[in-house]
């Protein structure tokens, strides 16, 4: 996601 963390940094990486 946007600022969701480690797993989501493949998509956004904040």
UniProtKB/Swiss-Prot annotation:
A Pfam family of this chain = Tetradecapep
Q: What task does this protein carry out? A: Has a stimulative effect on the contraction of gut muscles.
The entry's family comment says: To insects allatotropin.
- Which controlled-vocabulary keywords does the entry list? Amidation, Neuropeptide
Instruction: Give a yes or no for keyword Protein transport in this entry.
Output: no
Task: List GO BP terms, alphabetically.
Answer: neuropeptide signaling pathway
User: Which top-level group of life is the source organism from?
Assistant: Eukaryota
Residues bearing Phenylalanine amide are 14
Protein name, entry field: Myoactive tetradecapeptide
The molecular function GO annotations come to: neuropeptide hormone activity
User: GO cellular-component terms in the record?
Assistant: extracellular region
């Amino acid at each position: 996601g946007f600022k969701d963390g480690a797993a989501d940094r493949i998509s956004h990486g904040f």
